[in-house]
Amino acid sequence: MNLQQLLEQKISAALHAAGAPEGSPAIVKPSGKPQFGDYQANGVMGAAKALKMNPRELATKVLDVLDLGDMAEKVEIAGPGFINIFLSKDWMSQSLRQVLADPRLTIPLDSPKQTVVVDYSAPNLAKEMHVGHLRSTIIGDAVVRTLEFLGHRVIRQNHVGDWGTQFGMLLAYMNKLKAENQQTLSMELADLENFYRQAKTCFDEDPEFKDSARQYVVKLQSGDQECVSLWKTFIDISLQHCEDVYERLNVSLTRADVMPESAYNEDLPNVIDDLREKGLLTNSDGAECVFMDEFKGKDDETLPLIVKKSDGGYLYATTDLAALRYRERVLKANRVLYFVDARQSLHLNQVYAAGRKAGFVSPDMSLEHMAFGMVLGADGKPFKTRDGGTVKLADLLTEAQGRAYAVVKGKNPEMPEEELNRIAHVVGMAAVKYADLSKNRSSDYIFSFDAMLSLEGNTAPYVQYAYSRVVNVFKKGEVGNLTFEGDLQLAEPIERALAVRLLQFNEILHSVASEGCPHILCGYLYDLSKEFASFYEGCPVLKAEEPVRSSRLMLSLLIAKTLKQGLDLLGIETLERM
């Protein structure tokens, strides 16, 4: 049950019945303060303005025809015309009993379901994954998991960079090492970052090697069998590096989700031909460009989208247009979500516009750039190693696990080593993921191991610890699979607040799915964890008399189920002991 949506429908209907224009939105939001109710409808002001009517007068008319059944115990008008709704305890109690009995927590599958293509992670296979790939990978995956949970058909597209001039350089270096010593080649490929660096040094310093690298580009593009075989070997090793990172991060991407740049190579000439046929191409100094009036530069000059260089080479824009067309015609997408750095905003908007003008995508297909900010160091600059190098994601995860190990061992010195390592892995990966996911994706954030591993504040360890405390209530009381009888009491203010929070889970997930913002879910789980802490301190559970004891156990079980489900949608594991 989506409580916010239900109230929106009922109050919108009442607005219309009270004389407001049809389709007037109720604008229902959760209230910021308990004295203003559980939800507040703010749509009366806009409707009253359209009717040239006093807002409070219209609000009174709305209340006269509003039928919330047994949902609300009180509805009142506040201020210039806000409608405050106070939910009924009895209604919430009955609703939560239904939530408790349903493995899906009464969250239905969306209908109609959509086909949603999600483009995320997309590392360049010439190098190992670095910290810059973290945001796209984990934010995209959290949204994918949420969309799938809501019943949509999600098609993951890992648009990896496996093509381009840098691969000529890498293949030439592979061949050089192979000729010298096969074992040396295998050792070098174990560290792709160093391999790339060595190849680049040869390219910059050895003219003969540079010529060889350029020849390899030509060979690769012409389909030379030996060259393609060498390239496939490199790509396979590079993808294995990515898969190791995905597994450690509990990211759902697999080899089957890889749709590389090279997959579109054969279609690139067709893209150019179709753009030309539509009259969209302009030759500018030998390059083929699409000029669109809606994209202007500083001097009010129209910015070009270059799709073919003067030397005949294709660009990212050409591949992106081919991918766009594939996602429309083959994958039949209703929505395409691109989890790509905010700095690519102009590029993607140009691609979307060119794709629509060329008829590559239908007008009703939604193209959404889920832009995200940068990961910064303590100095407020892009996160780097101490010597100014790129932070490899694998190294960062290893350090996170090591730091988590030290924290857990410090609190549990007698814990067996195997359990210690398992908890350190879960907490370390969760800390890195949650620290990122809990920030609004459009913002930059400062990476801090100390902050993300803290047991205080909006962190993974805090939420994971809340879950383990709930589980401990049941262990301590030796409460097994009991059949709970009776209603939830909700006598204390914190019990009531928890009931409202638990009933908001559905609308939170729909916000994540529609906006592509997992920080909404993180904020919800943090609030739920904080409220549980207040409940745990102020409301005895196991020592309470019946029926209060059973009521509080039911509330505790609902909290545990919701925390576990919410963390699972973020790709974060729960622990019963920390």
Curated annotation (Swiss-Prot):
Principal subcellular localisation of the protein: cytoplasm
Superkingdom: Bacteria
EC top class named in words: ligase
GO CC annotation terms, alphabetical: cytoplasm
One Pfam family it belongs to: Arg_tRNA_synt_N
Keywords: Aminoacyl-tRNA synthetase, ATP-binding, Cytoplasm, Ligase, Nucleotide-binding, Protein biosynthesis
EC number: 6.1.1.19
PROSITE patterns according to UniProt: AA_TRNA_LIGASE_I (PS00178)
Recorded catalytic activity of this chain's protein: tRNA(Arg) + L-arginine + ATP = L-arginyl-tRNA(Arg) + AMP + diphosphate
Protein name as annotated: Arginine--tRNA ligase
